[in-house]
Structures are given as structure tokens and as C-alpha cells.
Design a protein with these regions (language model features):
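Divalent-cation-assisted or electrostatically stabilized phosphate/pyrophosphate-binding catalytic cores
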Residues: 197-209
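A short, conserved beta-to-alpha structural element at the edge of catalytic cores
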Residues: 96, 100, 208-224
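Cytochrome P450 core scaffold surrounding the K-helix E-X-X-R motif
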Residues: 142-145, 192-198
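Short acidic/polar inter-strand loop motif in beta-rich domains
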Residues: 188-190
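… and, occasionally, acidic/histidine-rich disordered N-termini of signaling adaptors
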Residues: 2-181, 229-248
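Short, flexible active-site loop motifs that bind/organize anionic cofactors or intermediates
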Residues: 86, 194, 209-210
Length: 248
């Protein structure tokens, strides 16, 4: 029965996906994090994670697999397994992205061509210094509390698995007390109100300024409230995934 097989596959994918996501709250030295993914359907293609590497370092990562279902969930599982087994390389975002790229390429078949956008940040939780790399994902935004300005961590790079040959770069990041970094997928930017007007990148930046709170969970709730007001009771048009990181 094709219908029963379909339901069983969805259940497997859901279980796999739920096992990949971290607890929503994370704290380490000067940093507080909160992450949440809201799917428009039973299964989303978004992936987020953050975890401690050693006594001072931690990583933040976010991905978006093209498509949904079992295939997307398995790609996420492979990515997490690959990252967790990377040891000392966890401090080098571009090495991690290159390894994931090779993994996605190797997992492709003629029937199923998977592509995954991905971003990776390694942070020193004491100094506030880090390294960031991006593979086709939305550029994170940094809210500088001292100036009230929102900056973009802009770094180009193709999606994982999109091309056989790929070069991934990394850039330094330095955060001060009161700063916040917001990772997001394009679901928030492309959300439309009842007249069809998108929030857009400028709208999102304004939303981040107006929503700021040193507690990342409260910051997220403030952003989500403004998003809900914008769509005006309509159903979500896409998955909505955020990681918010604040520096004490």
C-alpha cells in the first residue's frame, strides 16, 4: 500500500529530524543562544545546531536542504555525523564546509540531486572572536548594541553539492558586550502580508533593531510577534528558522 509506505517514511524522517535538533537554549561563558525552527508542514528542510567544542570554543551551524522528507532528513543526519567526527577541524569553518560538500556530492544519485545551503561559525566564548564560513545561505546579521546599527556578515560561497569544484572562504568575527548575531533562513524575508508585501531584508533589519533584548529567547519572541503581525493570521508560507546569539 503506497499510502502506508508514505506515512511510514514521513514518520522515519520526522524521528530522524527531531533527534538532530539541539535543546533550544545554550549558554557558554559570555554567550547565550536560542534556536528554533517552525515548519510549514509535517517536515521541514531546515537544520540548526550549536554545541560546545572545548573549554572555550563552541560552534553554531544552520542548513537548509532543498526539498523535504526522508532524503532531506538523511542529508541532515549525515552532515551532523560528519561534523561531530571532525575533531580539531571544528575550529576551521572552511575545512568543515569542504568536507560536507564532498559528502553531499558523494550522496547524490541520478534520481535524487540534493543541494544544501549551510553556514558555520566557530566562536571563542571568552574573547568574543570567531571564524565564519557560508555556503549559499542567508548572511547573518549582527546588531551592534553600542551603535544601534545592524551589520551583515557577507561572505559568498556556493551551496553544498551545487558544483563539483567549490572553494569556501572564512572571515573573522569579533563581538563586544551587548552585540547579537541573528542567523535565519529566507522564510522570514519572503513572508508576505495580505497585500503581498514582503518583509524583505531592510524590513528584517528594522525588526531586529526594534525587537532587541539581551535574552536571546525574548529577542526571538519579539521578532516572531512582529512576523506574526506582518502575515496577519495567514498560514506560514515557508519554514521559519532562527538562531539568536547574544554576548554579555
Amino acid at each position: 500500500n503506497h499510502i502506508m509506505v508514505g506515512f511510514e517514511e514521513l514518520e522515519v524522517a520526522r524521528i530522524v529530524q527531531e533527534s538532530l535538533f539541539p535543546k533550544p537554549d545554550f549558554e557558554m561563558n559570555r554567550f547565550r543562544l536560542f534556536g528554533r525552527s517552525v515548519s510549514m508542514g509535517e517536515l521541514g528542510g531546515d537544520y540548526l545546531d550549536f554545541f560546545k567544542v572545548d573549554e572555550t570554543g563552541f560552534v553554531v551551524l544552520m542548513g537548509d536542504v532543498a526539498g523535504h522528507g526522508v532524503g532531506a532528513a538523511l542529508i541532515m543526519a549525515m552532515a551532523k555525523a560528519g561534523i561531530l567526527s571532525s575533531g580539531e577541524q571544528l575550529a576551521s569553518p572552511k575545512i568543515i564546509l569542504n568536507g560536507l560538500h564532498q559528502m553531499v556530492l558523494a550522496s547524490k544519485s541520478s534520481r535524487q540531486k540534493k543541494v544544501m545551503t549551510f553556514q558555520y561559525l566557530y566562536m571563542n566564548s571568552v574573547t568574543g572572536a570567531g571564524l565564519y564560513a557560508n555556503a549559499g545561505a542567508c548572511s547573518p546579521l549582527v546588531y551592534r548594541r553600542s551603535t544601534g546599527i545592524v551589520e551583515e556578515l557577507k561572505l559568498t560561497g556556493g551551496a553544498l553539492g551545487a558544483f563539483k569544484k567549490a572553494v569556501f572562504n572564512e572571515m573573522p568575527v569579533l563581538l563586544a558586550s551587548g552585540d547579537a548575531v541573528i542567523f535565519y533562513t529566507d522564510g522570514i524575508v519572503e513572508s508576505r502580508d495580505r497585500s503581498g508585501r514582503e518583509i524583505g531584508y531592510e524590513g528584517l533589519q528594522q525588526m531586529l533593531v526594534e525587537s532587541y533584548d539581551a535574552d536571546p529567547a525574548v529577542y526571538y519572541q519579539n521578532i516572531f510577534a512582529r512576523y506574526a503581525k506582518h502575515i496577519g493570521g495567514q498560514e506560514a508560507q515557508d519554514d521559519l528558522t532562527f538562531i539568536i546569539m547574544t554576548c554579555l
